């Protein structure tokens, strides 16, 4: 949409100038009304009065108990020593005790209360630091003990594995030893069991009698029976955990 000079023909030539002068005349009127609303006091006075509304309620104090704006009073060494000594007797401050300390030390009761409050906070902080150091030492000692126990556990596990690996070899050696003992026992039993009387008769050159021959035959048959029994016992000693049927030899000597 475009504007041209033909549109201005509807308005008088002094229209814009009149509006400009009217705006300039209206501004002083507004300022006068604003000053009338505030009254005779200046705007700075009103701002200061607004800021002082909260200050009239509660009085503010600094950390040492003095009012804001007043010069801070620092405690001397005697006052500090007296307060420390009294704090050691009891960290709880009652109203009567607070007033007595304030009169004795020449301080305000609020200063005494704030000092006790700060001193309790410092004592709690120191106690927490001590507890932390103690717990830290306990943790470190337990950690070292845990490492030692883990090392011992690993060694024991290695010993158990070594013993498990040795068990099959030891069982084989035991089987061999049992077999050897059984064979040695059978050899000892199957030795010469001929009676000494017969040996002495042959050594002297006397011919054996009929009774002697019968005894010798009986002894030889008994010897064969012992050998057969020993052979059977050797067969049983050589077998480990095997079940089966073993046929007995025909006992022809009894027929």
Curated annotation (Swiss-Prot):
Sequence segments annotated as region (Leucine-zipper): 128-163
Molecular function terms from GO: DNA-binding transcription factor activity; DNA-binding transcription factor activity, RNA polymerase II-specific; transcription cis-regulatory region binding
Pfam families with a match to the protein in the record: HALZ, Homeodomain
Source taxon at top rank: Eukaryota
Keyword Cell cycle applies: no
Protein location: Nucleus
Family: Belongs to the HD-ZIP homeobox family. Class I subfamily.
Function comment: Probable transcription factor.
This protein's name: Homeobox-leucine zipper protein ATHB-23
Underlying gene: ATHB-23
